[in-house]
Amino acid sequence: MKKQIETTRLRIIPCDKKILEAILIGNEALSQLLSIEVPDGWTDNDHSPFEYAYEMIKAHHSEVGWWAYLPILKNENLLVGSGGFKGKPDAAGVVEIGYEIFEPRRNTGLATELARALVDHAFENKKVKKILAHTRAHHNASCRVLEKCGMLFTEQIYDAEDGELWCWEVPFNKRETIQSLIHNF
């Protein structure tokens, strides 16, 4: 799972150790390494998710592609957020996705394009049987993004760090049925 993902508007780059090191150093280092424009505030996160991904990839190089990805807007060569997985599939074949889009580029369909690409990419791996995601426990733009990716709301949970969350999932064997319903709606 190391390949770059291409969509209509995005080039989605898997973060290896070198890219994660550049993220941790700063925007200029990342810009120089990838020859892209890196705007201030491109991520809503502090560096902890990238630090964690770095440590995991450092310990398990084969997991490149199961952590962070960087979506680059092709026509501007601009970093517009981040996304990826929270590790390789577990024993049951479950992976979790996460994504974010740079605030000035939200509400343009980029989050949906990124999330769909991640879902499609994960399901290319025969070990993946189900994909999960979590949102805040209220209707928001992320809920609609996940619905457009074929995900269904499953339950509300409480997380000690994040509070109330809604859980979403799409099992591989239901994906085509859900997608056809969405596209015909």
List the predicted regions and their residue ranges:
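GNAT-family acyltransferases
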Residues: M1-E96, I101-P104, A117-H121, N125, ...
